Structure formats: structure tokens, C-alpha cells
Amino acid sequence: PNLDEKVNLIKLPGLDLFQTFSFKDRLKIFIKKKNKRAIDFYEFFSTFFGGFPEMRTFGERAKEFLDINNQFDIVIDNQSISYGLLKIQKKFPLLEVIHHPITKDYKFELQLNRSFMYRLSRHRWYSFLKMQKKVAPQLKKIVTPSFNSRKDIASDFSVNKENINVINNGLDIDIFIPYNEIKRNPTKLITTASADVALKGLDYSLKSLESLTDDFPEISLTVIGKLKKGGHTSRLIDELGIKDKVFFKTDLTKEEIAKEYASSSIAIVSSLYEGFGYPVIEAMSCEIPLIATNASSIPELVGDYARLIPPKNTNELSNSIRSILNNYSHYKKIAVKGRQHIIDNFNWLKITEEYEDIISKTINDFHKC
């Protein structure tokens, strides 16, 4: 991570087996590891059989580190929800940050492909959910970035809602700015999505684009994300015949992303689920008219400053794009108000003050016990 020079980074390295997907290379990494322990064997064999063990192994290594380093005032964990946290929680004030329950990712991935082997592979990959469902209900202090995630964590992980505090994520509002000097392309659409990730609903944006090509011959879609060669999204683009109208851009800085918004006319968030939709507030901060699904956390983020549509509805998306392109000045005025909404509610000063309060409360409550 990129850290301030005043922040000390303590590394707790595992085998790092996901640096490669070659079995031979992974085996070499495992064999070269000196003084192997049970946790290393678990990490290797779980990965070998298609699992993702890193959350569990990190939690165990963090517990071991904290057993001999007790100088910390509080421990903040980001979504590992691992067994090790239950032991850490007995010795330290613990604040667990959960973006959303990964049960949602699992659910939507199963909907993407119904073949037996695919479903079996997903079952193995998400096998860590069994651990998380056991650990989450026992955590005393949880922070999540939206009320929708709070509801889903309570439901899917059987957590008492009183233990879950909502603090929105913040945004660099001085980076995601309108860039009014950049001329907008009147028929350029933009979205942020990881190709082949079912949750992001990119399929519906692509199908909508195809349906609009007759009415708007110059229309195009820029996707902030990476296209997987030969993957589902790549095949769909070929099937729809829109290869010359879809452009993927990766490895952009925040400033470059903001400038992409500035040169576009409509931002689209066609997600099926968002624990906290960063693309939503990034687009709004850049004063671009926004179309987003009314799914999960999105309505509570956008307020009255975006055009909301049902998820998986290509016709509604196409009609919304037409409406905005045909009445752009009206929707641009809404977008200007939308930026002020983001400034008021998602600036880092507000968010950090809320985190300071919950951190102080977590420490005080621990020492009262």
C-alpha cells in the first residue's frame, strides 16, 4: 500500500501462492519455504484444491504477531473475518470493517454459469464463508459503509444489528472534479466494471449500447476495467457486433479516471449489487449525469441526483440514455447538484471524524469490561 511516511508497515507474509497460477511454481514456493508449520501446509493444500485460504491464514499470523506485541491500543481488521480475530478480540479492542457479505458475490457468480464443474469450483473458492459465518456473529464492533450492507450482514452472517455501525466511505473530492475545460463527447458513455464479474452487470450496459447504435451511430462506451481475452464479456461483445464501440482502459490514476468522466456525457452503473458503490459517487463528484440501478446501497448514496432503473433491465437503461441525450441540459443541472451532495456527505473530514468516534468508543467499551 501507499502509506504516509509516519505510518509503519508491518508485513506478515504468507506463501503468496496467488502470484502465479502454475502448479509447478506454487510447489516450488512451498518447497523453498523454510521451517514450514501447519498453517503453511493448510495454505498450500487449500489453494491446490481450489480454495482461497488467505483470510484464515492472515488471521492466524496476525494473532501470533499480537501475542508477542501487545503495545497497540486497538486492532482494525478489514474483512478477513477469520478465526484468529476471536482470540485477538479477547486481548485488544477490535474493530472489524466489512464492506459487504461475500455471500452476495457467491450468489451472483452461481447465477452466471450453471455448469456442475463451475459451481463446484465456486463452492471451493468461497469455502471461507463457512468460517466467516461462524466468526461474524461473535464480533463485538463492526463498521460497514452502507445501511444496505448493514442489513445484509445481519441477515447473511446472523449478526445483531446493534453491533453494526454505518460509516460511509469517503472520496477525494479535490481529485474527482468536473474539469470543465475538457470538452464532452456528446455520445460517449462511461462505466466502471471488472469484466466477467457478474455483480457489476456489464452485460446490460453492452446490450443497451447495441440497441442504441441505429439511433446514435457515433455512440460508444468506455469501460474503466480490464477485458479478459476469450472471457464471457469478450465473447458477448463479438456476438453483439459492437467491438468498434467499446473501449477498455486500465491502470489509470484517479486524475485520469476523473478526466475520462469529464470527456463523457453519461455515466452508467448497471451493478446488480454494491455494498458501497464507489463508481456512483466518483461519477457524481465529476458532475456527469448518472444512470444507476436501484439495487442494494445505490439509492441511499445517490439521493435524488441520479436516474435510477431496475437492475437487469436493458430497455429501461436504453430509454434512460435516450432521455438524457435528448434533454441534456436538464440532467446536467441535476448533476451539478449531485456534486454538492457528494461534497456534503462523502468528504474525508466528515468520514474520519466518524471513525475517530467509533475507535474511541471501541477502546472505552473494551476497558469497561
Model features per residue range: what roles?
Residues 259-264:
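Short alpha-helical donor nucleotide-sugar binding micro-motif in glycosyltransferases
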Residues 289-292:
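Short hydrophobic beta-strand element within catalytic cores of glycosyltransferases
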Residues 182-200, 206-209:
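Conserved donor-binding/catalytic core segment of Leloir-type glycosyltransferases
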Residues 23-49, 89-133:
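Acceptor-binding helix/loop patch of EC 2.4 sugar-transfer enzymes
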Residues 307-314, 323-328:
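Conserved acidic donor-binding segment of nucleotide-sugar-dependent glycosyltransferases
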Residues 232-255:
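Nucleotide-activated donor-binding/catalytic signature segment of Leloir-type glycosyltransferases, i.e.
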Residues 272:
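Aromatic "clamp/platform" in nucleotide-sugar-dependent glycosyltransferases that forms part
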Residues 148, 170:
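Carbohydrate-associated surface elements
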